[in-house]
Amino acid sequence: MHKNENNRLLGSVSLPDDPDRSLRPQVLDDFIGQEAARANLKIFIEAAKTRHEALDHVLFVGPPGLGKTTLSQIMAKELGVNFRSTSGPVIAKAGDLAALLTNLEERDVLFIDEIHRLNPAIEEILYPAMEDYQLDLIIGEGPAARSVKIDLAKFTLVAATTRLGLLTTPLRDRFGIPIRLNFYTIEELEYIVKRNARLFSVPISDDGAHEIARRARGTPRIAGRLLRRVCDFALVKQAKTIDREIADTALSRLEVDHLGLDPLDRNYLMLIADVFLGGPVGIETIAAALSEPRDAIEDIIEPYLLQQGFIQRTPRGRIITEKAWAHLGLRAPTQPAASATLSTPDLSTSSDVPVSSLIQKHLWEKDYD
């Protein structure tokens, strides 16, 4: 660092190649937030170490970016065992799972992300492996086929899912330690932002950290990403420190508002508000209109909007709340949405025209009326 750059970000900081990995805490005591989950895990880990046994199987449930993978890695470190990682969609056939399980040593941790996307046939093989530490495989085909039992080391399966409802009951019941992770508070995220800035050797003020934290959607991963983008702006502006003004300017340029809503969130809310007069509207129609997969909407967009009280899920579909109308700066219609069908665009799917094109055309016509 040059002497005349001591108080500047410009040229003084090089961010790591993999910032997410470098910022992850290594022990439970360094992990911020999720106090109940952390306290319980500490007890379970200590008990397993005292008994010299493998920890019971663990299932983490919660939206993306809350620390499921990080906690799994910390567990392996605290237990003093090896950590193996994979994801549900990657395990395509029985041989893939057998290779993973037979290479595990005593008390090792195997982490399977997105376990709700595991092939049902593979899931059947996993049952005896979790319960009896045995692998039941069929060798050969036809009349020559035979069943082979392979003994496995006593391991710990740690799985993560964003969709608990998609797990079958037999699989869900085999996890002795289910843990739900919740969105973080602004205070917790502010602490995380300050810690990450310190690791980056980037000076940041209290109000700057608070500004980033309150727009991070309750998610540490998003807080880390926003901090890196704010660092970019501060670098170019040659700011001495990241304060509220720098953070606000950067995040406004990124179209992240003061509650953390991004353009996709606002498009979601505007679609229901403007096209469907506040709802109710079905999730499939929303997915088609936004050109986004249904899973992405249910896993990424809706959890935060539900937590913030912007939308409600009803048997007839999604509706937006008074809070959402106010946030969008719009007035809620006085007539019920159900009786306002005449002003809703014709979204019949019998036409060859995609639903999303019809909705975009409707919004364009309203803009230029």
From Swiss-Prot:
Mg(2+) binds at residue 69. It catalyses: ATP + H2O = ADP + phosphate + H(+). Has 3 domains, the large (RuvB-L) and small ATPase (RuvB-S) domains and the C-terminal head (RuvB-H) domain. The head domain binds DNA, while the ATPase domains jointly bind ATP, ADP or are empty depending on the state of the subunit in the translocation cycle. During a single DNA translocation step the structure of each domain remains the same, but their relative positions change. InterPro entries: AAA+_ATPase, AAA_lid_4, DNA_helicase_Holl-junc_RuvB, P-loop_NTPase, RuvB-like_N, RuvB_C, WH-like_DNA-bd_sf, WH_DNA-bd_sf. SMART domains: AAA. Residues 185-255 are annotated as: Small ATPAse domain (RuvB-S). The lineage of its organism: Bacteria, Pseudomonadati, Pseudomonadota, Alphaproteobacteria, Hyphomicrobiales. Keywords: ATP-binding, Cytoplasm, DNA damage, DNA recombination, DNA repair, DNA-binding, Hydrolase, Nucleotide-binding. The keyword Zinc does not apply. Residues 1-184 are annotated as: Large ATPase domain (RuvB-L). One of its GO terms (cellular component) is cytoplasm. It is found in: Cytoplasm. Homohexamer. Forms an RuvA(8)-RuvB(12)-Holliday junction (HJ) complex. HJ DNA is sandwiched between 2 RuvA tetramers; dsDNA enters through RuvA and exits via RuvB. An RuvB hexamer assembles on each DNA strand where it exits the tetramer. Each RuvB hexamer is contacted by two RuvA subunits (via domain III) on 2 adjacent RuvB subunits; this complex drives branch migration. In the full resolvosome a probable DNA-RuvA(4)-RuvB(12)-RuvC(2) complex forms which resolves the HJ. The RuvA-RuvB-RuvC complex processes Holliday junction (HJ) DNA during genetic recombination and DNA repair, while the RuvA-RuvB complex plays an important role in the rescue of blocked DNA replication forks via replication fork reversal (RFR). RuvA specifically binds to HJ cruciform DNA, conferring on it an open structure. The RuvB hexamer acts as an ATP-dependent pump, pulling dsDNA into and through the RuvAB complex. RuvB forms 2 homohexamers on either side of HJ DNA bound by 1 or 2 RuvA tetramers; 4 subunits per hexamer contact DNA at a time. It comes from the Bacteria. Its main location: cytoplasm. Residues 1-21 are annotated as: Disordered. ATP binds at residues 23-24, 65, 68-70, 131-133, 174, 184, 221. This is Holliday junction branch migration complex subunit RuvB. It comes from Bartonella bacilliformis (strain ATCC 35685 / KC583 / Herrer 020/F12,63). NCBIfam families: PRK00080.1, ruvB.
